[in-house]
Swiss-Prot record:
Subcellular localization(s) per the UniProt record: Virion; Host nucleus
Mitochondrion as UniProt keyword: no
Motif (Nuclear export signal): 8-17, 81-90
Organism: Influenza A virus (strain A/Goose/Guangxi/345/2005 H5N1 genotype G)
GO BP annotation list: exit of virus from host cell nucleus through nuclear pore
Miscellaneous: Average number present in a viral particle is estimated to be 130-200 molecules.
Xref: Pfam families: Flu_NS2 (PF00601)
Cellular component annotations (GO), alphabetically ordered: host cell nucleus; virion component
Name of the protein described by the UniProt record: Nuclear export protein
Free-text function comment from the UniProt entry: Mediates the nuclear export of encapsidated genomic RNAs (ribonucleoproteins, RNPs). Acts as an adapter between viral RNPs complexes and the nuclear export machinery of the cell. Possesses no intrinsic RNA-binding activity, but includes a C-terminal M1-binding domain. This domain is believed to allow recognition of RNPs to which the M1 protein is bound.
Domain of life, source organism: Viruses
Length: 117
C-alpha cells in the first residue's frame, strides 16, 4: 500500500480540478496523515503487547483513534462525492483507486486497533 499511496498522492497533486486546489491539497495532507497513523498502529502491533508504550506516548490514544476513524470516513465520503461529479476518466480512475485504498486503510486500522485492545 505504500507505493499505492505514493502513486495516488502524486496523481492527485497533478490534477487540474475545477474545484479549489486548497480542497485537494487538504485531501492529500489527510491521506498522508492517515498513512503515517496507520503505519504507527502497525508498528505497535508488530511489537505486540505494546499497548503500554502506546498509552505512555499518547495518553489519549483511544480518542485519537476515534478521531482518525472520523477523518477517514470523511475522506471516503469526499472521494465518493468527487467520483460522482467528475467526468474526466483519469480523475475517475484516480479517485476510484483512492477510495479503494482508503477502505483498505480503514480495515487495517480496525484490525490493528482490535489487536491492541
Amino acid at each position: 500500500t505504500v507505493s499505492s499511496f505514493q502513486d495516488i498522492l502524486m496523481r492527485m497533486s497533478k490534477m487540474q480540478l475545477g474545484y479549489s486546489s486548497e480542497d485537494l491539497n487538504g485531501m492529500i495532507t489527510r491521506f498522508e496523515s492517515l498513512k503515517l497513523y496507520r503505519d504507527s498502529l502497525g508498528e505497535a502491533v508488530i511489537r505486540m503487547g505494546d499497548l503500554h508504550s502506546l498509552q505512555t506516548r499518547n495518553g489519549k490514544w483511544r480518542e485519537q483513534l476515534s478521531h482518525k476513524f472520523e477523518e477517514i470516513r470523511w475522506l471516503i465520503e469526499e472521494v465518493r462525492h468527487r467520483l460522482k461529479i467528475t467526468e474526466n476518466s483519469f480523475e475517475q480512475i484516480t479517485f476510484m483507486q483512492a477510495l479503494q485504498l482508503l477502505l483498505e486503510v480503514e480495515q487495517e486500522m480496525r484490525t490493528f486497533s482490535f489487536q491492541l485492545i
